[in-house]
From Swiss-Prot:
The keyword Protein transport does not apply. PANTHER family: MATURASE K (PTHR34811:SF1). One of its GO terms (molecular function) is RNA binding. Belongs to the intron maturase 2 family. MatK subfamily. The gene is matK. It comes from Amaranthus caudatus (Love-lies-bleeding). This is Maturase K.
Length: 504
């Protein structure tokens, strides 16, 4: 364990080192096991944690055996790996998962340090995805235009390997990665035929998501450096973007190239009201500038991706929208900047007059149609929004059934608690509440009315309104409302929203 701690306490300049030799060490499964334990802090129902210990340890055992890295040169049609054609996908999957565990170790160390309150050198604190919404409420009210950008992905796997060259000094690890990427391309086991890199297969999603996120990280690192060339800008608007230390030596060169090749003058980066938010495979770039400036940003991004990363992005993937006439559809919310009119009576001496004030307000609305579609797909209701029983859960105990329904309801309540209009959320809660009652009544071979009459209507009502009761105790209640607290409260401990279909 002392040797393990020694590896974890390595110098923080982890960009210049790699853990490739650990693949051939017996105790690499300890890293994988520790990684799975730390992941429990973030994801309550982490699915990937179940393979981290077992598969990586099996991988090491098989790599110690002989004649596994033997390719068949006599039979080109078989293209065997590890000596057995029917096992090649299994072994390759284990290696990619072990590779993903190892390369994620530096990021895990940064995340653990942030959770423990330790200072992270040369990086900003990691924040919840829900910190985006208070940020938008404060900043987007003063902006005019927004770029809705679909981040491009590389069409060739070699681009991913070239990206990793800036991170890894170990050539053998790059050769290993390149070897498996090209084998995967031949087997069509990682990427589906004739499809892009974004729809990853479920078995190898973790490995390719890491490579894709690393490429996006490269985009943003250079973008941050160019943006910091202007002393008028603040870095806090970029959220959780980690800085690349070894890029600082290339700042002057990059700026000169940008100006010379693209004809982009530096005042493009000196927009004092410029805010950037990334979510999933998209990003938003909002500015107080004119539409002409946003067009310059649009074609700058296209040239930037094409010339420096050999990634082609079509102009129709970047949309320019005016915030006053545009609704942002992202992260499960429909958000817009609306104009609210408020009339104030003012009196000066003996004269009184009315003042009509126009105030901008950032509204977040719960999308009822997609949520009902998710409930129908998960068999909680039919296409007509009528709640139905969850037949697959009737074999569970009553406590487990209530716990599953309650977990879904709490996740939705926490995630959409900051929305300005909660009427749609109450409809979703009603569907879940009645679906839970139908499931329990079906299990006990009774009707919903008889079941609720026997246990009391407060049986489910008290359970599903527990969060509202807690809020009503700690927060002031609206005097005009006799119900529970209905204000906007963002739960900033939210990391992700669970898919309803995964709760089965």
């Amino acid at each position: 364990m002392e040797k393990l701690q020694g590896h974890r306490e390595l110098d923080r300049s982890w960009q210049h080192n790699f853990f490739y030799p650990l693949i051939f060490q017996e105790y690499i499964y300890v890293f994988a096991y520790d990684h799975a334990l730390n992941k429990l802090i973030l994801l309550e129902n982490a699915i990937d944690k179940k393979y981290s210990l077992l598969i990586v340890k099996r991988l090491i055992t098989r790599m110690y055996q002989q004649n596994h890295f033997i390719l068949s040169v006599n039979d080109s049609n078989q293209n065997e790996i590890f000596g057995h054609k029917h096992k090649k996908n299994l072994y390759s999957q284990m290696i990619t998962e072990g590779f993903a565990v190892i390369v994620e170790i530096p990021f895990s160390l940064l995340l653990i340090s942030s959770l423990e309150g330790k200072e992270i050198v040369e990086s900003q604190n990691l924040r919840s995805i829900h910190s985006i919404f208070p940020f938008l409420e404060d900043k987007f009210l003063h902006l005019n235009y927004v770029l809705d950008i679909l981040i491009p992905y590389p069409a060739h796997l070699e681009i991913l390997v070239q990206t990793l060259r800036y991170w890894l000094k170990d050539a053998s690890s790059l050769h290993l990665l390149r070897y498996f990427l090209y084998e995967y391309r031949n087997w069509n086991s990682l990427i589906r035929p004739k499809e892009s890199i974004s729809p990853f297969s479920k078995r190898n999603r973790r490995f390719f998501l890491f490579l894709y996120n690393l490429l996006v990280y490269e985009y943003e690192s250079i973008f941050v450096i160019l943006r910091k060339q202007s002393s008028y800008l603040r870095s806090t608007s970029f959220g959780a973007l980690l800085e690349r230390i070894h890029f600082y030596g290339k700042i002057k060169y990059l700026v000169k190239v940008k100006v010379k090749v693209f004809g982009v003058i530096l005042w493009l980066f000196k927009e004092p009201f410029l805010h950037y938010v990334r979510y999933q495979g998209k990003c938003l770039l909002a500015s107080k500038g004119t539409s002409f400036l946003m067009y310059k940003w649009k074609y700058y991004f296209i040239a930037f991706w094409q010339c420096h990363f050999s990634v082609w992005s079509q102009p129709r993937r970047i949309y320019i929208n005016q915030l006053s006439n545009y609704s942002l559809d992202f992260m499960g919310f429909i958000s817009n900047v609306g104009l609210n009119s408020s009339v104030i009576r003012s009196q000066m001496l003996e004269n009184s007059f009315l003042v009509d004030n126009i105030i901008k307000k950032f509204d977040t609305i719960v999308p009822i149609i997609p949520l009902v579609g998710s409930l129908a797909k998960a068999k909680f209701c039919n296409g007509l929004r009528h709640p139905i029983s969850k037949s697959g859960w009737t074999d569970l105990s009553d406590a487990d059934i209530i716990d599953r329904f309650g977990r879904i309801c709490r996740n939705l309540s926490h995630y959409y608690s900051g929305s300005s209009r909660k009427k749609s959320l109450y409809r979703i809660k009603y569907i879940l509440r009645l679906s839970c009652a139908r499931t329990l009544s079906r299990k006990h071979k009774s009707t919903v009315r008889a079941f609720l009459k026997r246990l009391g209507s407060e049986f489910l009502e008290e359970f599903f309104t527990e969060e509202d009761k807690v809020l009503s105790l700690i927060l002031p209640r609206d005097s005009s409302s006799s119900g529970f607290y209905r204000g906007r409260v963002w739960y900033l401990d939210i990391i992700c929203i669970h898919n309803l279909a995964n709760d089965e």
